[in-house]
């Protein structure tokens, strides 16, 4: 499914200026865990940006993810001079035209990607931007660091399809359930001691080691490598026991285990409810996941941004390949509460109207803008790198101050590419309809580093 909205005053084909803001056609992914049909935010965004999608959305199909970027598996596209180009092709084509034009004039050419971004990332688009709409739990998984990603890509290119690491941020847009990072070891041990089905799934000779990380690793790897029939039988007993409880006797963790079992009966990943932290993010709260941090998204909607990778090492809650050995060796085994990203505020705007989520990586940051009765337009600080704008809800125009053009009739689901060093403004079209916008860009961290 692609974004085909071209109802704007600024025609992508007419101007070779490197500050053109252009519409993107983006691709949805129909993974089985996604919400079905019009219940999915991804489907609503598809309907919003292209009227023709309204007849294409099928209520029996899961719409799990919307991808925005230049990943080889689902690159965004741009209509340019009556051709449909992948985002990378579009950038390269326009950059070549700009360079050729500057070579015949006294003006110097500037970079669409941004000079610092090109030095740091070359011609690779620095990030992958997504929307997720989750019906059933995603796999117990973690992402490799840069070194391991290169090794996995070289050894297993059919499984791990790129050589990049995948740090990521998930910003909740609805209540958002997740398992993330290891619980304190004392909590895990307490569950082993008090939940017989969990204890019986571990070896009788499991030794409590003084080294907490090594002990935790032995618990995890022993569980992942346990006999499948043993795990299945113990989970069945656990499910039966929890179902025998009255509803008022069950706690949130009991309900989580029952939910996971109903979705993945007999899967060892169900036991990870006792190993990983269970959290429920409120809308606007954000979770950062670095390399080697185990996690599983369970339900809800989020905006997600990451390095441009699709590398996932799985070990549970999935019918897909489980790479138990790789996962067991790559996890950090860091215990404690998950890393929530505290949004930064702009001095001239309230947290209601602006939030910047900046995790500790160079590839990306995400800004949130909200237009309402009290704040009908917002000037966007230009980034020294490329940006992708997602209109999550509402109607607006974008005034491009760098080339004195305006894009009108933007609405829910409109997605745009913004070149580096472009000044622009969001303008609310209808004061009765609030507007929510997410902007992914290269982290200001790398520009601040270069200014030191």
UniProtKB/Swiss-Prot annotation:
Query: What CDD domains would the database entry show?
Result: cupin_PMI_type_I_N
List the InterPro entries. Answer: Man6P_Isoase-1, Mannose-6-P_Isomerase, Pmannose_isomerase-type1_CS, PMI_typeI_cat, PMI_typeI_hel, RmlC-like_jellyroll, RmlC_Cupin_sf
Cofactor annotation comment: Binds 1 zinc ion per subunit.
Q: Where is the active site?
A: 314
Q: Which domain of life is it from?
A: Eukaryota
Q: In which pathway does it act?
A: Nucleotide-sugar biosynthesis; GDP-alpha-D-mannose biosynthesis; alpha-D-mannose 1-phosphate from D-fructose 6-phosphate: step 1/2
Give yes or no: UniProt keyword Electron transport: no
Per the entry, what this protein does is: Involved in the synthesis of the GDP-mannose and dolichol-phosphate-mannose required for a number of critical mannosyl transfer reactions.
Family that this chain belongs to: Belongs to the mannose-6-phosphate isomerase type 1 family.
Its name, as the record gives it, is Probable mannose-6-phosphate isomerase
The opening ranks of the lineage are: Eukaryota, Amoebozoa, Evosea, Eumycetozoa, Dictyostelia
| Gene behind this protein | mpi
């Amino acid at each position: 499914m692609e974004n085909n909205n071209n109802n704007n005053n600024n025609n992508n084909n007419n101007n070779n200026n490197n500050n053109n803001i252009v519409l993107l056609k983006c691709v949805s992914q129909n993974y089985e865990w996604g919400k079905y049909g019009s219940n999915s935010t991804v489907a609503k965004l598809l309907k919003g940006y292209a009227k023709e999608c309204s007849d294409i959305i099928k209520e029996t199909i899961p719409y799990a993810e919307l991808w925005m970027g230049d990943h080889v598996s689902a690159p965004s596209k741009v209509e340019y001079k009556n051709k449909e180009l992948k985002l990378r092709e579009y950038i390269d084509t326009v950059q070549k035209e700009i360079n050729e034009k500057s070579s015949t004039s006294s003006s110097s050419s500037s970079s669409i990607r941004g000079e610092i971004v090109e030095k740091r990332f070359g011609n690779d688009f620095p990030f992958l931007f997504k929307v997720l709409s989750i019906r059933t739990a995603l796999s117990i998984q973690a992402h490799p660091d840069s070194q391991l990603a290169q090794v996995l890509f070289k050894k297993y290119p059919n499984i791990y399809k790129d050589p990049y690491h995948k740090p990521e941020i998930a910003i909740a847009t609805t209540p958002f359930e997740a398992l993330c990072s290891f619980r304190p070891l004392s909590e895990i041990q307490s569950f082993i001691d008090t939940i017989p089905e969990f204890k019986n799934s571990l070896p009788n000779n499991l030794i409590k080691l003084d080294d907490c990380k090594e002990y935790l690793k032995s618990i995890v790897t022993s569980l992942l490598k346990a006999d499948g029939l043993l795990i299945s039988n113990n989970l069945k007993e656990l499910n039966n026991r929890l179902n025998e409880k009255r509803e008022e006797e069950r706690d949130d963790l009991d309900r989580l285990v029952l939910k996971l079992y109903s979705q993945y009966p007999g899967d060892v990943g169900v036991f990870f409810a006792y190993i990983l932290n269970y959290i429920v993010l409120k809308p606007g709260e954000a979770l950062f996941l670095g390399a080697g941090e185990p996690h599983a998204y369970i339900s809800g909607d989020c905006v997600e941004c990451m390095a441009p990778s699709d590398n996932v090492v799985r070990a549970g809650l999935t019918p897909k390949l489980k790479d138990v050995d790789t996962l067991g060796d790559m996890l950090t085994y860091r215990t404690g509460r998950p890393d929530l990203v505290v949004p930064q505020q702009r001095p001239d705007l309230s947290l209601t109207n602006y939030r910047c989520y900046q995790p500790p990586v160079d590839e990306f940051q995400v800004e949130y803008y909200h237009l309402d009765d009290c704040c009908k337009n917002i000037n966007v600080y230009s980034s020294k790198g490329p940006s992708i704008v997602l209109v999550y809800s509402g109607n607006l125009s974008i005034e491009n101050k760098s080339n004195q053009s305006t894009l009108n009739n933007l609405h829910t689901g409109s997605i745009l590419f913004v070149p580096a060093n472009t000044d622009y403004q969001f303008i609310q079209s209808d004061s009765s309809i609030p507007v929510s916008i997410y902007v992914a860009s290269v982290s200001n961290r790398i520009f601040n580093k270069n200014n030191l």
